[in-house]
Amino acid sequence: MTENSVPVIKFTQHIVTTNKHVFSEHNEKSNSELQRVVRIILTDADATDSSDDEGRNTVRRVKRHVTEINLMPSTKSIGDRKRRSVSPDSDVTRRKKFRGVRQRPWGRWAAEIRDPTRGKRVWLGTYDTPEEAAVVYDKAAVKLKGPDAVTNFPVSTTAEVTVTVTETETESVADGGDKSENDVALSPTSVLCDNDFAPFDNLGFCEVDAFGFDVDSLFRLPDFAMTEKYYGDEFGEFDFDDFALEAR
């Protein structure tokens, strides 16, 4: 093979660089340690060959595409992440931390307080919400340390109202002793005198004429006469023959 028949290969390289900011949790490291470079290399073997008609040396071009991605730490992302971590919308920070209240591993909330007299913690129980546990802690704190104790919620002070009750003292009187006029309750006397009459004393049986109604004829019964045998002697002997004759 002659020297002129050896093809000439020409390599060309095209580099495209892109900077990409990413968040990294390793804030203690320097920026140089955090920076990374990702290279994507693609060689185009089907590049167009260039040749002349006079039979000169053929030059073959091979293109090499290189894409570089620079991974750089983003300070903005770190700041946003910190702000999101302390955002009040998050479930963790939305719950306020109460004094004497901690969450158990299974989810419930426990309340406990340190007793200054005994020098140890007193268990107050577990509750469904941290607010309930905080209220129980506040009551125990006021009971142990007084109204000046530090509580989770402001202690409502109720105004004390003094009620004066007037008591009437009564003296018991022994049998046979004199009683005061205040202790003796006299029985009510009748307003009618002995010689007075009741409103209906003068109204006899069937005497309705006092009201203007003449109903005497309504109660008038026919007269009937009885023989002397029936009412002759009040203590006379009973004679059965008298009744027998009447029955006939």
Curated annotation (Swiss-Prot):
DNA-binding region: 97-154
Source superkingdom: Eukaryota
An example Gene Ontology molecular-function term: DNA-binding transcription factor activity
Gene Ontology biological process terms from the UniProt entry: defense response
Subcellular location per the Swiss-Prot or TrEMBL entry: Nucleus
Annotated GO CC locations: nucleus
PROSITE patterns recorded: AP2_ERF
Primary location class: nucleus
SMART domains: AP2 (SM00380)
Subunit structure: Interacts with the Pto kinase.
Role of this protein: Acts as a transcriptional activator. Binds to the GCC-box pathogenesis-related promoter element. Activates the defense genes of plants.
Protein name: Pathogenesis-related genes transcriptional activator PTI6
Organism: Solanum lycopersicum
Source lineage: Eukaryota, Viridiplantae, Streptophyta, Embryophyta, Tracheophyta
Gene designation per UniProt: PTI6
